[in-house]
Amino acid sequence: MIDPAEYRDRFPILETCTYLINHSLAAMPAAAEDNLREYARMWRERGIRAWGEGWWEMPVSVGDQLGRILGAPAGSIVMHQNVTVAEAIVLSCFAQGGTRNRIVYEEANFPSVRYLYQAQPGLEVVAVPDDAAIADAIDERTLLVPISHVLFKNGEIQDVEPIVRRAREAGAYVVLDCYQSAGVVPFSLTELGVDFAVGGSVKWLCGGPGAGWLYVRPDVAERLEPTLVGWQAHARPFAFEPELEYAAGARRFLTGTPNVPALYAATAGYDVIEEVGVPAIRERSLAHTQLMIGLCDEAGLEVVSPREPERRGGTVTVSTPDHAACHAELGERGIVCDFRPDPLGGIRLGPHFFNTEDEVRHAVSELADIVATGAYERRQGAAARF
């Protein structure tokens, strides 16, 4: 079992608060600041030469490092700004308005993804109640199945395999959103067999914002041609040719100038996740979340997250009389967490491998006190924040 004492000094914010919001913005590794200084040094001292000394290749080289964590082959992951951009690029591979125009996903999908597909006039969106209903909703009219590996509100792990199997039978493509699983739940993108996967670095990967990513299964990459592209997608970008010739593999899913500083920061998170190992992180996470659920039961707090370990990601969501008010009061008590609205909502607590059992116990104890004493009532009307 991981000893958090070995890692806590690498995450400066842990000295100032009880930080249990790693499902939203994980604690920053101190090494990220060092990496950003190196970025600034390169820009200052090397100027434009930095592009040829690593910057230009970062969308692929950083993706390759992430691929080692996610079980993806080299060259199959490229870095983007965020998940919405990545999924829009995937969508651009397909002509809209034909008979195969259905998008099937679960109602609990993250809103940003839903907005993207709802905004397309040529698509028919089918939202089903849960993951068990997705496979049944897939038919020969289905184009894409954008699903979450772990639901953002309550941390429930979705059963991906039957969905992938049914989509393949029907000729549809699966886009797996791994934002809430990457870095805390072990999996292999190769073994899952999904066509595409997306995610970001801001959560369990400890990589900060602006480093989203897109995985394209190698055989899929070679037969698709996205239309939302830029010069990085060209086979010879510095030839500045007037016509597009697609690069090989996932490179053809790139756009324009990469977000270099965000990629510098992200590698600091990837380094520590690789060092600790996702299986070890998962073991620690399950111990934390099981302890948290038991403490909530003892305190009479209602847990919304799955109780079965195999169905639970890294987050425990606890229902309260007033989520916003309880969240505000927890913040005043030095506990950094967040909340999401119902249904399936509540206070979200996301301990990572560097958190301690004492922090878990403290957070649940304070939440129980806030609910039992009605202390949250003085915060009623608190604005929703992140």
Where are these regions (language model features)?
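Pyridoxal 5′-phosphate
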Residues: 1-386
